[in-house]
Design a protein with these regions (language model features):
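Walker B catalytic motif
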Residues: 25
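Catalytic-site signature of metal-activated, phosphate-bearing donor transferases
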Residues: 5-13, 19, 28-144
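Short, acidic/turn-prone active-site loops that include or flank metal/cofactor-
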Residues: 1-2
């Protein structure tokens, strides 16, 4: 087994809690997201999956890169915000990762996106990169 979904599913099999908060190695949760998670999960017990907004920043990004990749950049320099990611899931056997690349979760029956208002404005994942790393990553994904 050698693709991303397989690796993530192996990690899921090791989890013992009611929910799993799975983030990539280069993502950081905001402090507000960490603080609000217990209350969020307790008050919405029927949701099996949560979509979390992600703040992407790319140091060295130029207008040429933005045009080449068709990205949107807001006034804060955030790329493609809110860029929702499936990162919080109920720990049940039906929910698994699928696809070798650009993997996605399957097997859930209900989901909700964290809103961008109502006190959730600062609840997001932080995903910083450099342009060199972004170009290398794009080239890698093109080979898969």
């Amino acid at each position: 087994k050698g693709h991303f979904a397989d690796w993530k599913n192996q990690l899921i099999d090791m989890c013992t809690g009611d929910f799993i908060f799975q983030i990539d190695a280069d993502e950081l949760p905001s402090q507000m997201l960490i603080d609000i998670l217990p209350q969020l999960l307790e008050s919405n017990p029927d949701n099996e999956l949560y979509l979390v907004p992600r703040v992407n920043t790319v140091e060295g990004l130029t207008p040429e890169h933005i045009q080449k990749w068709g990205w949107r950049v807001n006034e804060k320099g955030w790329v493609n915000f809110p860029d929702y990611q499936t990162r919080i899931m109920k720990n049940i056997p039906e929910i698994k990762w699928v696809n070798k690349v650009h993997e996605r979760l399957d097997g859930f029956k209900s989901y909700a996106a964290l809103p961008l208002d109502m006190g959730f404005e600062d609840c997001y994942l932080i995903h910083p990169k450099t342009i060199e790393r972004q170009e290398k990553q794009n080239n890698f994904y093109d080979t898969l």
